[in-house]
Amino acid sequence: EYRRQRQMCIRDSYDGDVMSDMVSTAFGSLAMMTSVLVAPDGTTEYEAAHGTVTRHYYRYLQGEKTSTNPMATIFAWTGALRKRGQLDGLADLAAFADKLEAASLDTIRAGVMTKDLAGLVEGPAPKAVTSEDFLHAIRARLEA
């Protein structure tokens, strides 16, 4: 049984994990999905739905270039920053979160993305970049 509230589907933890993994496959990458956990007292936690990508992290520690998609992590941070801005009345912090999200999405729309997304694009081939290069591209848009 589930309840719908706005555009959310509220589930028990395990069922929610399974359902969210299934839904994410329809969009091509679990790395594009965040999770927001809200306690009855209003405490809120934002996280990347995919958890950690230890295989890529260990490669990175060995000096190898990786193409891990950081979008879910970025959006977990922006969600938390926006919430903190709302709670503390810091409009500039919430605005920064919005600007970072827009810069991230605009980078992908411009055809610069990590390998997992580049493989899903039909038509002209996008530029598949490393995680670090993707973050640099987002930063360049953010600072423009």
Could you describe each region identified by the protein language model?
Residues 11-99, 106-107:
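Glycine-rich phosphate/nucleotide-binding loop
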Residues 62-68, 83-144:
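Internal helix-turn-beta structural module
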Residues 1-9:
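Single conserved hydrophobic/aromatic residue that forms the stacking wall/gate
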Residues 1, 40, 70, 124-126:
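Proline-rich intrinsically disordered, low-complexity coils
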